[in-house]
C-alpha cells in the first residue's frame, strides 16, 4: 500500500506542476495575442466613396487634390499640448533637421488629425483604472515576485508589461478618436508619408493603389502625344543649380497673335499689347500664391496673405466668407479653360474675374502644334476669350503659350526619378513659376500641405479625393517634390502654415554660362 501511496503522491505532484506550467503557457499566450492590430496604412485602403472619373473631361480644375478613407481634422492647440509642434521649431535651414518629426512619426502609422475635443468622463475613469491596474501589476511582479522567478522571468515580465502599456495607449487613442466630431474632414495620407513629402522624399510606390493605377493609365494613354527625348539629370541638382535651371528655362510666354493660325485669323487685336512679363515693370517685393486646398481652412492666414504686395489665386476660389483663412486681396488669377466654358462658373458675370489680371491656359499636344490645338482644344476657351476681350478690352487677360507649360513639364521630368504623368503641370505649379518671374520673394500657402492636411479638395467645395493633393491627371507628386527641394522657408512654416518660401528669379544669381541640364 505504501508504494502505491507514494506513487499516487508523485502523480499528484506531477499533475500540479503540469497544470501550473499549462497555466503559465496560457497566460503568456493570451498576453502576447492581446496586442491591438496596427492600423493599416491609409495607402492600402479599400475605397468607400464614389469618386469622379480620373480621365477625360473630369480633369481636375486645381492643382491640389485628394482619396477618401477617414475623416480627420486638427487644431494647433492639440499639438501644442502634446509638445509636438515645439519640437519642429528649429529655425531656418534644411528639412533634414527635422529630428523631432522623426521621433514623433515613429510612434504610429496613421496621420491622426483631431479637432479640439474633451474626453468623456467615462473615458477618463477607464484610463485611470487602466493605469492603476498596470502599476499594481508591475509592482507586484517586478518588485516582489521577481527574485522568486529569477532574472530571466523578470525581464520577460518587463517586456510583457511594456507591451501591455503600448496596447493601453492604443486603446486610449481609439477611444479619443471615437469621441471626436470629425466634421467631414478627411485624410488618407499617413504621417510617415506626409513627413517624407515635407522632406521631398516620396515616390509613386507610396501612393494608394487607386492613384498608382491612375498614373499607369495616363502613362499608357498618353493622350497628348508626349515623346520625351530628353534625359534625366545624371545627378541630383542642388537647390541653387535647380533654381538656375528654372530661371533660365521657365520664361513666361503668352499668345500674342503673331503665330499662325492666330495671325491669319486677326487675333492680334484681342491679345494685350503689353506682354505679361512687362505688365508690372518694377515687379513686386513679396507675393503670395494661395492654394485652393482644403487644408487652408482654420489656418487664420488671411491677414498674412493680404500683407503681400501681390496675391495669386486659382480658378473659382472665392474670398468672401473665407477672409480669415485666405484673405481678400487678389492681384492675379490663373484660370483653367474649364472656367471659361462651364456655365456653372459664371465667368461672364462673376465678380471673381473682374478687376484682376487673368491668365488662362488649356492643355495642348506635346509638340505645341497651335493649329491642332486651336481647332481641337481640351476645352474650347477661344470663343469666350474673344467675347470677354471685346467687352473688357482694358482688363489684362492672357492665354499661356503651350510651349511654356510643356517646358515646365520637361523640367519636372528631368528632375524626377520616375516617369511622370504625360500631362501638363497643375495650375498651382504654373502659378508658382509665374510669380517667381515677377516677385523677389514668393510665399506659397498649402501647396505642400501642413499638418491640417485633409482630403477635402478645395476649401470652398465639399468634395474629397486624394488625387487633389497627390495627383492623378497632373504630376502633382513630382511638382511638389521639386518645389520642396528649392524651399528656403523654415520647417515650422511648412508644418504650421503649409508655407513654402521661394526666391524670385530677380534675386537668384547664376553663372553666365551654366551647363546644368
UniProtKB/Swiss-Prot annotation:
Q: What gene name is given for the protein in this entry? A: st6gal2
Glycan-linked positions: 201, 298, 328
One Pfam assignment: Glyco_transf_29
- Its transmembrane ranges are 11-31
List UniProt keywords, sorted A-Z: Disulfide bond, Glycoprotein, Glycosyltransferase, Golgi apparatus, Membrane, Signal-anchor, Transferase, Transmembrane, Transmembrane helix
Per the UniProt entry, the Enzyme Commission number(s) are: 2.4.3.1
Family of the protein in this entry:
Belongs to the glycosyltransferase 29 family.
- According to its UniProt record, where is this protein mainly located? Golgi
This chain's source organism reads Xenopus tropicalis
In its UniProt entry, what is this protein called? Beta-galactoside alpha-2,6-sialyltransferase 2
Protein's cellular compartments: Golgi apparatus, Golgi stack membrane
Provide the GO MF annotations for this entry.
beta-galactoside alpha-2,6-sialyltransferase activity
Q: Which Cys-Cys disulfides exist here?
A: 244-510, 287-439, 457-468
Task: Name the top EC class.
Answer: transferase
The annotated topology with respect to the bilayer is: Single-pass type II membrane protein
Which reactions fall under this protein's catalytic activity?
a beta-D-galactoside + CMP-N-acetyl-beta-neuraminate = an N-acetyl-alpha-neuraminyl-(2->6)-beta-D-galactosyl derivative + CMP + H(+)
Q: Which GO terms describe its cellular component?
A: Golgi cisterna membrane
Q: What does this protein do?
A: Transfers sialic acid from the donor of substrate CMP-sialic acid to galactose containing acceptor substrates.
Protein's UniProt keywords contain Glycoprotein: yes
- UniProt keyword annotation of Transmembrane helix present: yes
Amino acid at each position: 500500500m505504501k508504494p502505491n501511496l507514494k506513487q499516487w503522491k508523485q502523480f499528484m505532484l506531477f499533475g500540479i506542476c503540469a497544470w501550473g506550467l499549462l497555466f503559465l503557457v496560457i497566460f503568456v499566450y493570451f498576453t502576447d495575442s492581446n496586442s491591438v492590430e496596427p492600423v493599416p496604412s491609409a495607402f492600402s485602403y479599400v475605397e468607400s466613396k464614389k469618386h469622379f472619373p480620373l480621365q477625360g473631361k473630369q480633369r481636375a480644375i486645381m492643382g491640389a487634390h485628394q482619396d477618401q478613407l477617414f475623416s480627420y481634422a486638427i487644431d494647433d492647440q492639440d499639438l501644442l499640448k502634446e509638445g509636438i509642434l515645439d519640437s519642429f521649431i528649429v529655425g531656418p535651414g534644411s528639412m533634414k533637421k527635422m529630428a523631432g518629426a522623426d521621433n514623433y512619426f515613429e510612434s504610429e502609422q496613421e496621420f491622426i488629425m483631431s479637432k479640439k475635443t474633451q474626453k468623456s468622463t467615462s473615458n477618463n475613469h477607464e484610463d485611470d483604472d487602466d493605469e492603476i491596474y498596470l502599476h499594481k501589476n508591475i509592482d507586484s511582479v517586478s518588485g516582489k515576485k521577481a527574485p522568486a522567478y529569477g532574472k530571466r522571468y523578470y525581464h520577460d515580465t518587463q517586456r510583457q508589461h511594456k507591451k501591455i502599456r503600448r496596447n493601453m495607449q492604443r486603446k486610449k487613442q481609439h477611444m479619443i478618436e471615437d469621441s471626436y466630431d470629425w466634421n467631414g474632414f478627411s485624410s488618407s495620407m499617413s504621417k510617415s508619408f506626409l513627413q517624407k513629402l515635407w522632406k521631398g522624399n516620396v515616390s509613386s510606390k507610396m501612393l494608394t493603389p487607386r492613384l498608382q493605377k491612375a498614373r499607369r493609365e495616363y502613362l499608357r494613354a498618353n493622350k497628348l502625344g508626349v515623346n520625351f527625348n530628353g534625359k534625366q539629370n545624371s545627378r541630383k541638382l542642388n537647390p541653387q543649380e535647380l533654381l538656375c535651371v528654372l530661371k533660365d528655362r521657365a520664361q513666361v510666354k503668352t499668345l500674342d497673335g503673331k503665330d499662325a493660325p492666330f495671325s491669319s485669323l486677326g487675333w492680334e487685336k484681342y491679345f494685350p499689347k503689353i506682354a505679361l512679363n512687362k505688365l508690372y515693370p518694377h515687379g513686386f517685393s513679396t507675393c503670395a500664391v494661395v492654394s485652393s486646398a482644403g487644408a487652408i481652412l482654420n489656418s487664420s492666414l488671411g491677414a498674412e496673405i493680404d500683407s503681400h504686395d501681390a496675391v495669386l489665386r486659382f480658378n473659382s476660389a472665392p474670398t468672401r466668407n473665407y477672409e480669415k483663412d485666405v484673405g481678400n486681396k487678389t492681384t492675379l488669377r490663373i484660370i483653367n479653360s474649364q472656367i471659361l466654358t462651364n456655365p456653372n462658373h459664371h465667368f461672364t458675370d462673376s465678380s471673381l474675374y473682374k478687376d484682376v489680371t487673368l491668365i488662362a491656359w488649356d492643355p495642348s499636344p506635346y509638340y505645341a502644334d497651335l493649329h491642332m490645338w486651336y481647332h481641337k482644344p481640351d476645352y474650347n476657351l477661344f470663343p469666350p476669350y474673344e467675347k470677354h476681350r471685346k467687352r473688357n478690352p482694358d482688363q489684362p487677360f492672357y492665354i499661356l503659350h503651350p510651349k511654356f507649360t510643356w517646358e515646365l513639364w520637361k523640367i519636372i521630368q528631368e528632375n524626377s526619378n520616375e516617369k511622370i504623368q504625360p500631362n501638363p503641370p497643375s495650375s498651382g505649379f504654373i502659378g508658382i513659376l509665374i510669380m517667381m518671374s515677377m516677385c523677389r520673394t514668393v510665399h506659397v500657402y498649402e501647396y505642400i500641405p501642413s499638418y491640417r492636411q485633409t482630403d477635402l479638395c478645395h476649401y470652398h467645395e465639399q468634395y474629397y479625393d486624394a488625387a487633389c493633393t497627390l495627383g492623378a491627371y497632373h504630376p502633382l507628386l513630382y511638382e511638389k517634390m521639386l518645389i520642396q527641394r528649392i524651399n528656403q522657408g523654415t520647417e515650422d512654416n511648412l508644418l504650421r502654415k503649409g508655407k513654402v518660401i521661394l526666391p524670385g528669379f530677380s534675386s537668384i544669381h547664376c553663372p553666365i554660362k551654366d551647363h546644368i541640364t
